[in-house]
């Protein structure tokens, strides 16, 4: 019962034509024609050195201002390129201003090293080493 072979239905030409038409329309939807090519400025490229004795490579070519601007823009850091952070990791260290005013004379936040007689004595004994002070 489980192995009953089903009769194979032979599709007619209209059905075959409809399948081919759907495939053709799907290909046309996904195709994209590229007419303008340029180098990706975000990817590092290897320069190809020219042959020093060839005459056609030694001709001076005008500099492409648009391409140079793209290269210079890609070489900048993210803080110079964008006004705001683009990723979560850029948020760390984006703002360089301190959150509070660093007043050096405020004793609540600045705990400087205070030296007294006991601390000076202990610092000198630690400076001599363990073998001298035994």
From Swiss-Prot:
UniProt main location, coarse: cytoplasm
Gene Ontology MF terms in the entry: microtubule binding
Subcellular location: Cytoplasm, Cytoskeleton, Cilium axoneme; Cytoplasm, Cytoskeleton, Flagellum axoneme
Coiled coil: none
Cross-referenced Pfam families: FAM183 (PF14886)
Stated role: Microtubule inner protein (MIP) part of the dynein-decorated doublet microtubules (DMTs) in cilia axoneme, which is required for motile cilia beating.
Name by which UniProt lists this protein: Cilia- and flagella-associated protein 144
Organism: Homo sapiens
